[in-house]
Amino acid sequence: MLDILEIRKYLPHRYPFLMIDRVVELIEGESITAYKNVSINEEIFQGHFPHFPVFPGVLLIEAMAQACGVLGFKTANKTPEDGSIYLFAGIDGVRFKRQVVPGDRVYFECKVVSAKRGIWKFDCVAKVDGELVTSATIMCADRVVG
């Protein structure tokens, strides 16, 4: 539904911190499904870990937050160019169930739980081959910058 060029319109992140490769489903105000292709060519694997490459859990959480940001921006019909930004405001109930390794395609499924006074709450999961990798409740703050 959104390729990388479209995603870049809704996220201010750029290489090497843009964690979403494609959005495959988006229902404004409700949910998003996006994915990231994990490659051995990513710089993070030079140090995490050279002889046992594992994609860091904290970057899985960041990818979830970025998917939430795309959903929020699309729902509110805003972009970073308008001076809007979604800031990572909090996280609850994080669980890591399996490792993510080079060659995996990680799907992120995020659903809006609430949106009040610029604070959005999302229930999120990450999956590889249909198997649960990570789950969390993420909060984002919709703010104006500049």
From Swiss-Prot:
Active site: 48
Stored SUPFAM superfamilies: Thioesterase/thiol ester dehydrase-isomerase
Keyword flag Membrane: no
Pfam families in alphabetical order: FabA
Catalytic activity: a (3R)-hydroxyacyl-[ACP] = a (2E)-enoyl-[ACP] + H2O
Chief localisation class: cytoplasm
Any single biological process term in GO: lipid A biosynthetic process
EC number: 4.2.1.59
Cellular location(s): Cytoplasm
Gene Ontology CC: one annotated term: cytoplasm
InterPro entries: FabA_FabZ (IPR013114), FabZ (IPR010084), HotDog_dom_sf (IPR029069)
Gene Ontology molecular function: (3R)-hydroxyacyl-[acyl-carrier-protein] dehydratase activity
Enzyme class: lyase
Keywords: Cytoplasm, Lipid A biosynthesis, Lipid biosynthesis, Lipid metabolism, Lyase
Similarity comment: family membership: Belongs to the thioester dehydratase family. FabZ subfamily.
Function: Involved in unsaturated fatty acids biosynthesis. Catalyzes the dehydration of short chain beta-hydroxyacyl-ACPs and long chain saturated and unsaturated beta-hydroxyacyl-ACPs.
Name assigned to this protein: 3-hydroxyacyl-[acyl-carrier-protein] dehydratase FabZ
Species of origin: Teredinibacter turnerae (strain ATCC 39867 / T7901)
